[in-house]
């Protein structure tokens, strides 16, 4: 087919575009062509076309010494885009070394920090990733129209790290920082970054419905536009998954986790892969019947860590997975140990504090002093207040009503299903008084959750008391009967009575047989 037979689908488009170019040439409008050049670089970088990116970048590079250094910088960027992290780092190491003290070194450091921020993130090295990202943002070198996009994506990366770590203050800072970036050209990519950060802020605040809507929209737009590699919307897909979990849409959350897991393999993101593995275990650990499978998987992940020293940054994720399991089986000592060795991870510290609140209730005034600025804080505070019998039944119902109504507005279900059976029963009773389809559905889920939990302590014969279950847990340890008594603050004579009742109810003859039953019920 000849060129003359090809026509534009839009009347006058070809001639109009040609006229724009002719006018730019006539006016010697170099900025017009520079913006076209930059726009093409951006598109190639976001769509994972590293080789084409490098070729296009080289079209503006001369043979001067500075030009040759810039060529190497663009080569490093191209390797980042093509996910060859090792080669990218080797080029950057050489560039930094050879340009020390040179005028072009600040530009090299900007490129290096941008690349290393992304590489360190995907390798799970958050401290270095944050350091490099902030250094790149604060670089004295600016790159014209590319700069707002670079800054936006780096702030988005910082926000993602802080979301994973549950550092709410830093998430809010990112939400503020992104609004301070000027966008005179109306760059869509910067708008996407703003939306992504807003979805992460909403998720952290407990506004799950709004977070889901925004994050899902960003995922659809960016994946349709071919965003891949380090530019893939993994952060927003993570938000979508978290929201689905909080909605108690478990099958959908697991399905999306598998999608993100497959994408992480394609995009060579070790951290996202392990995050998906642990995310799946967290979801499965909500069901007592799956705890055996989850415990086995945790041990398999630990073995992988031991065999591969490069995975050391994933160790806290595996500890996190075990915390979910041990929380479900009420193994407080092990949870405290895991929390203690991950004291530098805000999310793990948060889990530890929450766990201690469940077992060592604060006084009423302390709970009333808790903040309620976000949806999550309001729900959590009123759930805790509803547990104080000293407030009286009417006041307890009022607290729970506030929590439930805010939960319906925010789409928060799972936070209620995590509560003790007494609170679940209160929700069931409340559903009979409030006219809400959402609450009716939550009530049915509460009934199912109580049934699941009860299977854990059904032994076939006469049921053990809660105190007897606590003693049974310790029988599989190396502690003597006297030591168990001291740990649980039980007198010697009372311990003898507990042991006698446990053996009788379980129809066993000795401590070893009782321990085997405890293990089969996943109490230890």
Identify the function of each model-found stretch:
Residues 473-477, 519:
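Short, locally clustered residues in the helix-turn-helix/winged-helix DNA-binding domain
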Residues 23, 43, 78, 119, ...:
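Residue-level signature for tetratricopeptide repeat
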């Amino acid at each position: 087919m000849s060129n003359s037979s090809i026509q534009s689908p839009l009347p006058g488009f070809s001639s109009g575009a040609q006229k724009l170019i002719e006018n730019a040439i006539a006016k010697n409008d170099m900025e017009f062509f520079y913006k076209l050049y930059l726009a093409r670089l951006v598109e190639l970088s976001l769509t994972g076309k590293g080789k084409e990116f490098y070729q296009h970048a080289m079209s503006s590079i001369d043979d001067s010494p500075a030009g040759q250094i810039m060529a190497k910088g663009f080569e490093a960027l191209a390797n980042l885009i093509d996910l060859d992290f090792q080669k990218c780092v080797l080029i950057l190491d050489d560039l930094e070394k050879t340009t020390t003290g040179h005028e072009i070194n600040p530009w090299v450091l900007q490129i290096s920090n941008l690349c290393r921020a992304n590489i360190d993130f995907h390798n799970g090295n958050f401290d270095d990733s944050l350091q490099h990202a902030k250094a790149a943002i604060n670089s004295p070198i600016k790159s014209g129209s590319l700069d707002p996009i670079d800054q936006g994506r780096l702030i988005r990366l910082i926000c993602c790290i802080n979301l994973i770590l549950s550092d709410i203050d830093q998430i809010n800072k990112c939400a503020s920082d992104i609004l301070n970036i000027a966008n005179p050209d109306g760059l869509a990519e910067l708008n996407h970054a703003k939306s992504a950060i807003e979805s992460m802020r909403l998720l952290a605040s407990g506004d799950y419905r709004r977070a889901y809507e925004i994050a899902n929209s960003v995922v659809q737009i960016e994946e349709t536009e071919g965003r891949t590699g380090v530019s893939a919307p993994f952060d927003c897909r993570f938000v979508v998954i978290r929201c689905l979990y909080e909605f108690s849409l478990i099958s959908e959350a697991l399905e999306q986790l598998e999608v993100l897991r497959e994408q992480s393999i394609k995009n060579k993101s070790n951290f996202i892969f392990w995050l998906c593995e642990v995310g799946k275990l967290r979801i499965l650990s909500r069901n007592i019947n799956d705890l055996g499978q989850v415990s086995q998987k945790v041990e398999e992940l630990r073995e992988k860590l031991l065999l591969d020293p490069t995975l050391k940054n994933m160790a806290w994720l595996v500890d996190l997975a075990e915390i979910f399991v041990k929380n479900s089986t009420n193994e407080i000592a092990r949870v405290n140990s895991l929390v203690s060795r991950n004291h530098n991870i805000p999310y793990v510290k948060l889990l530890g504090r929450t766990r201690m609140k469940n077992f060592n209730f604060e006084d009423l005034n302390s709970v009333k002093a808790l903040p309620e600025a976000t949806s999550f804080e309001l729900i959590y505070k009123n759930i805790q207040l509803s547990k104080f019998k000293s407030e009286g039944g009417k006041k307890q119902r009022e607290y729970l009503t506030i929590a439930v109504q805010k939960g319906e507005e925010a789409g928060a279900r799972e936070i209620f299903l995590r509560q003790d059976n007494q609170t679940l029963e209160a929700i069931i009773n409340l559903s009979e008084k409030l006219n809400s389809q959402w609450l009716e559905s939550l009530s049915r889920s509460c009934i199912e959750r109580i049934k699941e939990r009860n299977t854990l302590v059904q032994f076939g014969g006469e049921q053990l008391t809660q105190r007897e279950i606590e003693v049974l847990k310790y029988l599989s340890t190396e502690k003597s009967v006297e030591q168990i008594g001291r740990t649980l603050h039980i007198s010697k004579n009372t311990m003898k009575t507990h042991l006698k009742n446990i053996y009788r109810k379980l129809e066993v003859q000795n401590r070893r047989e009782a321990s085997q039953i405890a293990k089969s019920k996943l109490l230890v």
